[in-house]
Amino acid sequence: LIVGQAPGIRVHNTGIPWNDPSGDRLRHWTNLDKKTFYDINQIAIIPMGFCYPGTGPSGDLPPRKECASLWLAKLLAGLPNIQLTLLIGQYAQQHYLGKQAKTNLTQTVASFADYLPTYFPLPHPSPRNNIWLKRNPWFEKFILPALRITCSTILSITP
């Protein structure tokens, strides 16, 4: 299961989740091709918000809270065989991890092993997060290989 934030304007307009540069980066991070990524028999994609929330001063606004409270439990009830949930960004992490989340996203992502095998927290793959990625080179060096191995093992794909 991939839990993101809310669709950006491009995704909102096309109706295809992760159909933007963030999705390209997420597929690179997970080492999944588009065919596998969008295979509904292997991967479910659920955002925290289902509509484009609009733009704020530093990017898209947060997902609207009423979406998650109204739909998430109902959708998850229809997904009984979830083996791993990728928590993309702070909103998904705060919702699913609650008090188990660390003080901030960086600490939560660095502590990914604490949440396995159920969850794998990740930063949002948006190009707006390039500064975070540059400030945290350990993410690419240590976290991405672990993510790729975890995904390939669950999906029975050769890394």
Predicted regions and their residues:
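Glycine/proline-rich loop-helix segments at beta-alpha junctions forming the active-site rim
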Residues: G49-P159
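Conserved beta-strand scaffold positions in the cores of enzyme catalytic domains, especially
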Residues: I2, I43-I45, Y119-P121
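Generic beta-strand or strand-like secondary-structure segments
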Residues: P21, R25-L32, P47, C67, ...
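Short, basic/glycine-rich phosphate-binding loops at helix/coil junctions
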Residues: A6-R10, Q42-P57
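Adenosine ribonucleotide-centric catalytic and binding domains
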Residues: L1-Q42
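Residue-level preference for alpha-helix termini and adjacent loops
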Residues: G15-P17, Q42, P47, S111, ...
